[in-house]
Amino acid sequence: MRVDSTVLALVALATDCLGLAIKSNEPELLRRDALPIYKNASYCVDERVRDLLSRMTLEEKAGQLFHKQLSEGPLDDDSSGNSTETMIGKKHMTHFNLASDITNATQTAEFINLIQKRALQTRLGIPITISTDPRHSFTENVGTGFQAGVFSQWPESLGLAALRDPQLVREFAEVAREEYLAVGIRAALHPQVDLSTEPRWARISGTWGENSTLTSELIVEYIKGFQGEGKLGPKSVKTVTKHFPGGGPMENGEDSHFYYGKNQTYPGNNIDEHLIPFKAALAAGATEIMPYYSRPIGTNWEAVGFSFNKEIVTDLLRGELGFDGIVLTDWGLITDTYIGNQYMPARAWGVEYLSELQRAARILDAGCDQFGGEERPELIVQLVREGTISEDRIDVSVARLLKEKFLLGLFDNPFVNASAANNIVGNEHFVNLGRDAQRRSYTLLTNNQTILPLAKPGEGTRFYIEGFDSAFMSARNYTVVNTTEEADFALLRYNAPYEPRNGTFEANFHAGSLAFNATEKARQAKIYSSLPTIVDIILDRPAVIPEVVEQAQAVLASYGSDSEAFLDVVFGVSKPEGKLPFDLPRSMDAVEAQAEDLPFDTENPVFRYGHGLEYEDN
């Protein structure tokens, strides 16, 4: 007989502390009762959760189910009704995503301490959980991640995958954990374990490439590094593994942030392979999962967004895979909004016709616990009071969310040492580790006539450059000229091709064709035919660049690196060690012909997964 996961969760909560209760004696109980149970660290976590839950009003419970972005700033109330003060003081919310650049670690730590202080002033004093999208690399997109700023700067996860070094991934995660902890961030809205089986998809830079086995191997170390020693605890940063059940196979490579990219498809009937990294994450102790916006088409599943889909969340994730942790939806499934000045409808794909109230009910019924990017607790209150959703069902999700706060130690010490933050974040050791990874992750695709490394350019050697500032060359005492006719070598840094999209938010997603247009190809060809040229192609997606490979003297691939890293590799200060984490297709025809859900399905690629040359030892 199949037992509902909701019942199992309540039974577990009621019985986990039984052993402790039996062992208790009366004097000990008297000492422990000096504080409310939920504030008393001598009680086990499940007893504290149960006690706090029993004290909460429906409105306070509803507030726990929402996870909203905020930026650094004052806590004063404002006329829009959505300030931090309103969300904490009136809407009872305690989960926030820090959605702004961090330019001063101490200042950010002080801001988060201020938020925690405000939370302690509420009736029950439930502490705040601060989360963040990735902020240790080069991506700058309010919807997906932030440039490192004051944090140590590493290659994107693709670059870590290119190095195929689980210990390095563990080291990165431990560094990121220390830097997050220093400012008060306790939740990482990553890793992204989608497989990059559709080369046009705009989210590939956040993946670990095309190989499910490699992704699984690396993700285990990633999660363990963020959690620290053992299970989730006071020195942990919890991770949110996404996007279940694997966001890679997007129809035509479009992204489901947007209405035209809402479909996810499996023409190769390869659903199971996309689940492999999630199974590895669960085995490694993942405590939170995020489904993607997409709706599956051409499958036996209902064609509705994954967070609305009970077959996905309850039957597959909780039932078949046995997950009993938190399911956090992706952002903005209920309410239409603006991101910047771009209007964004709620990503309620397949259930657009439902009201906001009905969408919230559908998400809870599917088995999700928390609504990302929303601040609508009044909907939950209405659903319970109307009898659509039981308060017992709300209690199950609230208990999961509270338990996580207790495990993280937030109830016992929500504050950080702000004065120490600047000494931890971006310290010399962490920065050097990131810089070394940037250099090592470079992949040498071609090296005709062994032009690289340019270890000792002769005095007076002149360079034509594109894609980076000449000041980096001047600092090395190299001469930069304005035309190829004057130069001895050309050094070019190019982003992987994409088709710009309209809208301030939409434009951040590199989408569409992976090939340079005819005009740009002709322009580059003139350079390649004029002088020896070294190209660095920045692979946030698998570029279609056979003409570059054929015509340039040497081609390097990178996955998030600064100009100093590029020049160190070019001039032999560092060696490229990376191997391609995906195939590089030969043509857009080949890309369009491949099945979105099958890895390594592109016909006759320019380079296969795993390609990467090495510098010869001189």
UniProtKB/Swiss-Prot annotation:
Q: Which cysteines are disulphide-bonded?
A: none
Q: What is this protein called?
A: Beta-glucosidase C
Q: Which UniProt keywords apply?
A: Carbohydrate metabolism, Cellulose degradation, Glycoprotein, Glycosidase, Hydrolase, Polysaccharide degradation, Secreted, Signal
Signal peptide range: 1-19
Q: In which pathway does it act?
A: Glycan metabolism; cellulose degradation
Single GO BP term: cellulose catabolic process
Which residues are sugar-modified?
N40, N82, N104, N211, N263, N417, N448, N477, N482, N502, N517
